[in-house]
C-alpha cells in the first residue's frame, strides 16, 4: 500500500490522462456488448458535448491543481485534519478512511447541495439533461460545476488532512467509479444489487438520472453507497422504466448543443414534477 501511495504522490499528468482515456474506451466498448438500452443515436455525435465538458473539467482541475497540492502539503506538514488526529493505524486503514471521507465531502455533499439550492441546481442541470446516459456523461459538467466540485474537494482535503498520495488515489478511483456507474451497461440484477450495498452500482446511479422526482433527488453518492443509505437518500427503481433527462427541460435537441448547455444555468427556474411511480 505504501508503494501505491508513493506512486500517486508523484503520478504524472500523462498517467492520469491515460487513466481517463482507458476508462472511457473500456466502458465505451463494453456498452456495445452488454447495453442496458439500445439507444437510437449517433454515439459519436452524442459524445461531442460530453467530451467538450470533460475537457473543460480537465483544464479547470489542471489550472487549479497547485491549490490542491498546497493545501494537502500544508495540512500534512502541520499534522492538521482528521487523519492526522487519529492514533497510528495500519496504512491501509488510513488510506481507506481518507478515500471514504473525501467521497463524502468532495462528492456526496456538493451533489446533494446542487439538488437543494436552486442556482446550484440550474448549474448541475447540464449533467442531468443528457437523454442517453452513457459513460461519456460521467464528466458532463458545466465549468461552474467543475469549480464547485473542486472547491469541495479542497474543503475535503482540509478537513481530512489527507496527503497528496491519498488525494490523487481518491480522484483516480472517483473517475473510474463515475465512468462505471454512468456506463450504459447491464449487470445481472443480483450482482448489481449486491454491489450497491457497498458501492454505487450502475442501476443505483441510473435511478438518480430518472427524469422526475423523487428519484432525481436520490442516490447522490459517487464511490461508496454508505452515504445514501446512512442519510436516507437511497432509492431503488426498476431499470426497465427509466427515462433519462429532466422533465422541465426536455428539449433533446437543445440539450445536445454546447452553446445551449453553457447558457443553461442562466435560464429561468422551472419547478420539477413528481413521478406517479413514487406513489406505488
Regions found by a protein language model. Name each.
Residues 242-280:
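A membrane-cytosol interface segment of integral membrane proteins
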Residues 19-29:
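Hydrophobic core of alpha-helical transmembrane segments in multi-pass integral membrane proteins
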Residues 15-19, 42-55:
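Loop-to-helix transition at the N-terminal end of transmembrane alpha-helices
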Residues 53-68, 75, 83, 89-244:
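Membrane-embedded catalytic scaffold of the fatty acid hydroxylase/desaturase
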Residues 10, 14, 43-46, 161, ...:
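Membrane-water interface of alpha-helical transmembrane segments
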Residues 1-13:
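Short, strongly hydrophobic alpha-helical membrane anchors
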Residues 1-4, 77-84:
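Membrane-interfacial helical/loop segments at transmembrane boundaries in membrane proteins
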Residues 28-47:
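Membrane-interface helix-loop junction between the first two transmembrane segments
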